[in-house]
């Protein structure tokens, strides 16, 4: 574990060094500022933990990428992105550190980068699974452990990113139940009618009882996400 963590830190530091070198040679003041921020972000995460939304996005990408590199990953699913990223987003938005538009741009960049990842396959598998789909399932909306709907601004922005980028990854899913906001369901349907095949819809009122019947506690079942194609599971407890 320590070796893996050290490797992740070393990997991020290489990007910090490269961004700093690029900034020193850059004559465009706007781009130079961007590169200096990137260098600082990569020096901080994942080693020191994210302090804001921009760093959280960078940390998310490093971790997702490293998991794929380590295992030639299949179904390395980001899960409830709108839930674990929201505290960073709200903090920075409330303080004026970022705008909603900039946060949306960062998310759009993540959506693009998720399509960079590929899986090394043998010849037969490559023929049967042609293309770049790695089943990186990212899910938005739904309820928390206390049966309270937790759809938030990022839930909508996840859908917006899929509209903007219009690429197969992430495999966007949404959780729906009788507490889902009507405008969230309508917005998800707007993406559906584009014909891209996203999002997939998962009914909390069916899936939560089914997970309980398989041995999960009610609290864990309410916090489910989707792995790979369609497999519901509690985050962090897949083994």
Q: Where are the predicted features?
A:
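Mature extracytoplasmic enzyme cores
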Residues: 1-24, 35
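Conserved catalytic cores of very large enzyme subunits
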Residues: 1, 30, 34-37, 41-239
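Charged, low-complexity interaction regions
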Residues: 25-29
């Amino acid at each position: 574990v320590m070796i893996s963590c050290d490797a992740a830190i070393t990997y991020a530091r290489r990007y910090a060094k490269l961004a700093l070198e690029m900034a020193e040679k850059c004559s465009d003041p706007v781009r130079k500022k961007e590169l200096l921020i990137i260098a600082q972000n990569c020096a901080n995460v994942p080693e020191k933990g994210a302090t804001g939304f921009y760093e959280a996005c960078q940390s998310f990408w490093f971790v997702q990428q490293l998991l794929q590199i380590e295992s030639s990953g299949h179904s390395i699913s980001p899960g409830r992105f709108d839930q674990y990223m929201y505290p960073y987003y709200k903090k920075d938005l409330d303080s004026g550190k970022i705008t909603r538009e900039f946060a949306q741009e960062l998310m759009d960049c993540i959506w693009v980068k998720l399509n960079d990842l590929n899986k090394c396959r043998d010849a037969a598998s490559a023929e049967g699974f042609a293309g770049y789909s790695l089943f990186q399932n990212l899910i938005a909306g739904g309820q928390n452990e206390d049966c309270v709907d937790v759809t938030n601004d990022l839930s909508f922005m996840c859908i917006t990113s899929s509209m903007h980028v219009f690429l197969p990854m992430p495999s966007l899913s949404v959780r729906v139940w009788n507490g889902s906001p009507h405008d969230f369901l309508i917005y998800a349907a707007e993406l559906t009618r584009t014909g891209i095949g996203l999002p997939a819809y998962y009914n909390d009122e069916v899936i939560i009882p089914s997970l309980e019947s398989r041995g999960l506690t009610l609290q864990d079942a309410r916090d489910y996400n989707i792995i790979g194609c369609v497999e519901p599971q509690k985050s962090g407890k897949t083994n």
